[in-house]
Amino acid sequence: MSKIRVYELAKELNVSSKDLITLLMDEFGVEVKNHMSAIEDEEAQLIKELLATKPEYVEGSLEDSKSLVDEYEEILQNELNKAKKKRKKNKREDKDDENEELETEVIEIGETITVKELAEKLNKPSNDVIRTLIFSGVMAAINQEIDFATAEKVCESYGVILEKLEVIEELEAVEVEEDDEENLEKRPPIVTVMGHVDHGKTSLLDAIRKAKVTDTEAGGITQHIGAYTININGEEITFLDTPGHEAFTAMRARGAQVTDVVILVVAADDGIMPQTKEAINHCKAAGVPMVVAINKIDKPGANPDRVKQELTEHGLVVEEWGGDTICEEVSAKSNLNIEKLLEMVLLTAEMLELKANKERKAKGTVIEAKLDKGRGPVATLLVQNGTLHVGDAIIVGSTYGRIRAMFDDTGKKIKSAGPSIPVEVLGLSEVPEAGDRFNQVKDEKTARIMADKRKDKEKSDSLMSGNRVSLEDLYSQIKEGKVKELGIIVKADVQGSVQAINQSLEKLSTDDVKVRVIHGGVGAITETDITLATASNAIVIGFNVRPDNNAVAQADKENVEIKTYRIIYDAIEDVKSAMIGMLEPEYKEVILGSAEVRETYKISNVGTIAGCYVLNGKLQRNAETRVIRDGIVIFESSLSSLKRFKDDVKEVNTGYECGLTVEKFNDVKEGDILECFMMEAIKRKEL
């Protein structure tokens, strides 16, 4: 039977706990110690009926209690007599309860709380709380988490009410907010420029923006992630100036799909280089369309046709050769064909039908963030949907804030920013990380609570092992439906080995699991490989190469598996063995034995007992059994009991008689054949 606490009932009835306790003890004879005591639902219902008939009780008046009791005299006579005897005894307790109620404290927690945090909320020494837990049968250290029910027992012993923190607007609900088709409008494409070092990525952005930022950057390497919006023929394009593909993939690893189109810059005199190849693989893994810009075509030794030939080797066939990859020959230095390249970007974006709803709450991604001495945490946000205004409350990853000021890419103060517009904002509580998602919420309090919840979740997630794919747990992850594809990154000492391993691995694909080599390259296993593996939930296989120290540290941090081999066959066999373990075993039926029913006996509360003679093999108790009549299987079940004379036995061999019952089947007749069998699992040895 369910119960309700006194203070909860008092709150429902809009009376003080003190008055309710008096009513319970004096008029109903229900003995309660204080406002934390629990009473039966039946008694609570009776009190509700009493107060419903006499609303003056709700005002806190107890003077007319005698006349009310008269109305319920028959029901309550026994309780009244008991209550009179207990009044004197409970007077002192009532006084204590009054004082206790005045000091009653209510604290709120989430699903779990550490012992230390609970002690701080109760304003009690940690040792006292640990002692209370031990008396409750819970052994917990100071930094150990306890659940809500355990914390509630501790609080009850201190006379404190514990309430579960009210969940305010889950971020997931904000993320999946759907837009009406009629509210969607065309938005500018977001473009990332990628390519090998010194192939002219920043120079190309210079030519596009008509501003010389290259000269201010050391060594020709971009020093930061910037975001700029340009206007061409009345249409806008937003460019993210990333240091190659590392930031692109790092953001994707954090769940942020920012880029709509990638401009792949390839120098006409150099052709496809290792970082170009990496950029291509990263784009393919992310499923982002590419527009190839063959740069430096005005340079001596430029050979655009060789570049196009090399592109085909990586699955990118240009349009003029019958493929679907848009390719433009440009020169950032002499500003040649830049307009044409941008038109191709807009054409690609048009095919993608990029739309957003600027009327909804804003959401997007952090492009970069830093701590400024004078301005505090500063973040560059890319609005991907909705409109962001100064004064909006936002949650960004596990931090939050209210936007105090907003600047565009030229440093000009603005009041709002729509879809695909990058802005720099002030007002966050902490510095977020690049790739963090941001969402606008109704107020700062909501943002703070959601950020705290996110921090708690991150803390609990960090205590649990990551769910990255490894060869050892591949089978269990497949069964749980977590993995449908095994992504592999291959690094080897020579290109021939890379190609050999790639071809061998991809041949292992089955209907259940596809093996996909995301990236193959020559050289040591680096941080870049681990970053790509993190983003793609892949494993890294090295042949005659080793990971560097930074790669090992990052792999440990991200729970990415690195396997190194000296023999190609071993690498193939390891992946094959993991996949064979994933395959469902084949089952073969093994006949144990059969028996003929010679007599049947019906016994009440037991059913039909069959007296049988074992013809061949043996019968086993609990074995799968089929009942065959005139050569036709009429029922399949199992042997629920098996006896020889009066003794229970596990099995009966050929030539012996026995008595048995078939589970859930009583229609056994003389002449029936009972066949015992088992299904034997046979491990798959081939894919």
UniProtKB/Swiss-Prot annotation:
Pfam families: EF-G_D2, GTP_EFTU, IF-2, IF2_N. This is Translation initiation factor IF-2. Residues 241-244 are annotated as: G3. Residues 195-202 are annotated as: G1. One of its GO terms (cellular component) is cytosol. It comes from Clostridium botulinum (strain Alaska E43 / Type E3). One of the essential components for the initiation of protein synthesis. Protects formylmethionyl-tRNA from spontaneous hydrolysis and promotes its binding to the 30S ribosomal subunits. Also involved in the hydrolysis of GTP during the formation of the 70S ribosomal complex. GTP binds at residues 195-202, 241-245, 295-298. Belongs to the TRAFAC class translation factor GTPase superfamily. Classic translation factor GTPase family. IF-2 subfamily. GO terms for molecular function: GTP binding; GTPase activity; translation initiation factor activity. Residues 186-355 form the tr-type G domain. It comes from the Bacteria. InterPro entries: EF-G-like_DII, IF2_II, IF2_N, P-loop_NTPase, Small_GTP-bd, T_Tr_GTP-bd_dom, TF_IF2_bacterial-like, TIF_IF2. SUPFAM superfamilies: Initiation factor IF2/eIF5b, domain 3 (SSF52156), P-loop containing nucleoside triphosphate hydrolases (SSF52540), Translation proteins (SSF50447). Residues 220-224 are annotated as: G2. Keywords: Cytoplasm, GTP-binding, Initiation factor, Nucleotide-binding, Protein biosynthesis. The keyword Cytoplasm applies. Residues 331-333 are annotated as: G5. It is found in: Cytoplasm. Residues 295-298 are annotated as: G4.
